[in-house]
């Protein structure tokens, strides 16, 4: 039968997310912990917290929505970005570090600088975000 190697997947997720984020940050001339926001694939809280601890990221800079939505697969980072945008916490000039992993043991990360202002009427659900 088919079996998932849970510990192997956990180790891959934590190590690849951390390495990918560090490589992207290094290319940008910064450390991951300097990003205003770090958005990870919302697989489970244990992975998210392990990556956060490994990189020394302030929990207040790593929002999560897995408590509300569960693991939404490849949509988790875009949905988390949507929630952050609509919370009113994301502001022009902020740097975001994004990381995801998934099928076939693939992973990737990038850094972006946000420049879109948040209209006041969209600032409606900051309370839906928790922090790792």
Residue ranges, per PLM feature:
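Buried hydrophobic packing segments
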Residues: 20-21, 51, 77-84
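Hydrophobic pocket-lining "lid/loop/helix" segments that shape and contact the acyl-thioester
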Residues: 1-67, 118-132
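Active-site-adjacent helical/loop segments in soluble small-molecule enzymes
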Residues: 65-77
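Generic structural "secondary-structure junction" signal
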Residues: 4-6, 11-12, 68-71, 92, ...
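A short linear-motif detector with a strong N-terminal bias
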Residues: 16-19, 75-78, 89-92
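Conserved beta-strand-centric core segments of catalytic alpha/beta enzyme folds
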Residues: 81-132
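Hydrophobic alpha-helical segments
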Residues: 54, 58, 69, 83-87, ...
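Short active-site-adjacent structural elements
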Residues: 47-49, 74, 105-107
């Amino acid at each position: 039968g088919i079996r998932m190697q849970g510990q192997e997947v956990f180790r891959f997720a934590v190590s690849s997310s951390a390495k990918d984020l560090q490589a992207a940050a290094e290319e940008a001339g910064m450390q991951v912990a300097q990003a205003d926001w770090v958005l990870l694939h919302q697989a489970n809280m244990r992975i998210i917290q392990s990556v956060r601890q490994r990189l020394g990221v302030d929990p207040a800079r790593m929002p999560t929505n897995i408590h509300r939505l569960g693991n939404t697969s490849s949509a988790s980072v875009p949905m988390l970005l949507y929630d952050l945008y609509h919370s009113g916490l994301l502001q022009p000039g902020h740097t975001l570090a994004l990381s995801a992993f998934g099928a076939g043991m693939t992973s990737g990360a990038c850094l972006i600088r946000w420049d879109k202002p948040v209209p006041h009427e969209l600032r409606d659900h900051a309370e839906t975000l928790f922090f790792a």
